[in-house]
């Protein structure tokens, strides 16, 4: 249905242009002009289908066919314009008006097909896959609009609450506490309301947040902020500039006394001391920015400086899955998946003179814990992987897409293969076809090197041209009877 809508939109725009030109030129809208306009609309239908076919051919295999299609459309339109446009020299007024409608209508339809359709396709599909993300579908657009609509509504309610509390005769810190309590419960409600995600919270230590601490976490997505605010009932956060200046929630974080990292941690410590005295924890992302691939980057020393200056424990929280649901590459795209958080044991702040060693030690601990979550939840049971695998074959033909949907369901998302194939090493997939098993195994473990081999050149071209492809994934067109296969830890046949 998405391709149908993308093909119909240029025709609808062309129809509006034709009607507008008729009104501007004073051409009467009668039965003759209606029939002619419908005829032009039908020609535009063919042009849109040809343009879409060229776009899909390039998207599926990488072969550029759009220029050839545009050339054919140009000569077809030129023939129609010359044939019907010749009527402009007729002396009869009706024939003259028919010629004008034909001339302007065909030109409008061609221009719209040449411009609107490729721009729309690039915006929703090819530009997303070029940066390693999934293409938009109607379902994903609805899900994303639902999530952001829910989020914006919550922010508006919080701003209304702040406005309502403003004239009341009570201390500002009490008002802030009311807003903080509201945020804590609203973020919990938001995560529960996300129908395409499942929230898993692991608190093996029984942490209650009764005592303030410097809470540190790995950073993958803006969802991390919502998750931490839903976990910590009473906390302020050290944020980046984009959070501070956000037109949606910037006013809220400023009202609550959140702090800007650009101010410098030396200046933040005295300001945060008052909040800590009131029982607030301090949330810091030591990486300083979101990770694009989920890997935990080097920790900066600011959080550990604050812990030493304020006399607080370090409380690590390891997050998994947020970067899959809303990645740095595609922040305005909400996907299926798991939101997992694990609260780790507190550690006392160490020697104030050695922040660097503390940061390195905390980073190593976070990477170990993240790897444990990765090995537990980077499995076929995580709905993210099935969703991404199906989306990698979306818009590559209805037969191929539905074949993959059925095959993935029958194979139970390749759970058996993931269980018996080593999670580290080289895996050769003989007769890989379009590559669904190869891509699933590659997604489930970043330590696998996958080599897919198949005799069908078209299938290999399709497999190679996927947004899931990574440097560790290779597809080879070869005859299995004569192919030189690499040494591998597992062969799949």
Positions of PLM-derived features:
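Non-catalytic C-terminal accessory region of glycerolipid acyltransferases
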Residues: 142, 268-394
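Conserved class I S-adenosyl-L-methionine
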Residues: 424-433
């Amino acid at each position: 249905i998405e391709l149908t809508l993308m093909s119909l939109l240029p025709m609808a725009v062309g129809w509006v242009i034709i009607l507008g030109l008729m009104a501007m030129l004073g051409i009467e809208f009668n039965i003759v002009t209606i029939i002619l306009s419908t005829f032009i609309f039908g020609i535009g239908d063919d042009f849109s289908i040809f343009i879409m076919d060229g776009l899909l051919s390039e998207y599926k295999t990488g072969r550029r066919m759009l220029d050839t299609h545009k050339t054919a459309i140009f000569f077809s339109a030129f023939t129609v314009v010359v044939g019907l446009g010749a009527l402009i020299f007729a002396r009869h007024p009706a024939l003259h008006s028919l010629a004008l409608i034909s001339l302007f209508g065909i030109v409008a339809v061609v221009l719209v097909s040449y411009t609107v359709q490729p721009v729309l396709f690039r915006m929703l599909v090819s530009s997303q896959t070029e940066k390693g993300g999934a293409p938009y579908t109607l379902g994903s657009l609805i899900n994303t609009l639902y999530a952001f609509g829910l989020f914006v509504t919550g922010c508006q309610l919080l701003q209304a609450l702040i406005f309502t509390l403003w004239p009341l005769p009570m201390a500002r810190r009490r008002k802030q506490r009311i807003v903080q309590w509201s945020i804590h419960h609203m973020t919990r409600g938001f995560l529960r309301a996300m129908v395409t995600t499942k929230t898993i919270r692991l608190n093996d230590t029984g942490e209650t947040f009764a005592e303030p601490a410097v809470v540190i976490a790995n950073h993958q997505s803006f969802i991390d902020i919502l998750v931490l605010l839903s976990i910590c009932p009473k906390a302020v956060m050290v944020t980046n500039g984009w959070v501070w200046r956000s037109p949606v929630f910037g006013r809220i974080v400023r009202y609550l006394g959140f702090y800007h990292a650009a101010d410098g941690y030396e200046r933040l410590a005295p300001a945060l001391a008052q909040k800590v005295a009131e029982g607030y924890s301090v949330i810091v992302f030591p990486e300083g920015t979101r990770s694009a691939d989920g890997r935990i980057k080097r920790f900066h020393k600011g959080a550990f400086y604050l812990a030493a200056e304020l006399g607080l424990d370090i409380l690590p929280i390891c997050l998994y899955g947020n970067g899959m649901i809303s990645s740095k590459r595609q922040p305005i795209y909400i996907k299926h998946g798991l939101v997992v958080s694990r609260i780790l044991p507190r550690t006392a702040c160490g020697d104030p003179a050695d922040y660097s060693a503390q940061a390195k030690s905390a980073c190593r601990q976070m990477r170990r814990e993240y790897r444990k979550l990765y090995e537990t939840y980077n499995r076929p049971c995580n709905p993210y992987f099935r969703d991404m695998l199906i989306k990698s074959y979306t818009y590559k033909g209805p037969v191929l897409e539905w074949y993959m949907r059925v095959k993935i369901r029958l194979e139970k998302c390749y759970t058996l293969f993931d269980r018996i194939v080593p999670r580290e090493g080289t895996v050769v997939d003989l007769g890989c076809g379009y590559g669904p098993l190869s891509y699933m195994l590659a997604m489930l473990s970043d330590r696998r090197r996958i080599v897919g081999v198949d005799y069908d050149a078209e299938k290999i071209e399709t497999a190679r041209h996927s947004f899931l492809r990574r440097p560790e994934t290779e597809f080879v067109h070869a005859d299995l009877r004569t192919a030189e296969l690499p040494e591998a830890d597992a062969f799949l046949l």
